[in-house]
Design a protein with these regions (language model features):
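Nucleotide-sugar donor-binding/catalytic module of glycosyltransferases
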Residues: 1-130
Length: 131
């Protein structure tokens, strides 16, 4: 069983989803990345399939008719096999050091006398200018 399942809901995300996926691959075999293509009309499905072929033990591509963000998240939940679950939107990315620390903390909690059902961490919103 994977430690963490991460669902990436995607709709016409070809221009930015790779940055998101690449930032999550740092978790290696500890995580499963579920790329949920929500009926995109661009290259989103193709990119998802490429990652699933390249990283078959980490990435799974899920394709469905467009049902909206919530249904894409639900598809991720239905397909998740990890102990913990996280949603990262396709236009977001995670900081490598913070991500590794989160995984380390989850493992330490699992080995201790008590575990957690939910882990909450800080986040930073960075608005990139169009310059």
């Amino acid at each position: 069983m994977k430690l963490l399942s991460i669902a990436i809901p995607c709709y016409n995300s070809q221009d930015y989803m790779e940055s998101c996926i690449e930032s999550l691959l740092v978790g290696g075999e500890e995580v499963e990345i579920l790329i949920v293509d929500d009926g995109s009309s661009d290259r989103t499905a193709e990119i998802a399939d490429d990652y699933a072929r390249k990283y078959p033990t980490i990435v799974k591509a899920i394709h469905q008719e467009n049902g909206g963000h919530g249904e894409a998240v639900n598809a991720g939940i239905r397909n998740a096999t990890g102990l913990y679950f996280k949603v990262v939107d396709s236009d977001d990315w995670v900081n490598k050091e913070a991500y590794v620390q989160i995984l380390k903390t989850l493992y330490e909690l699992l080995r201790g006398p008590q575990t957690v059902d939910l882990l909450i961490s800080n986040f930073v919103y960075e608005k990139r200018s169009e310059e």
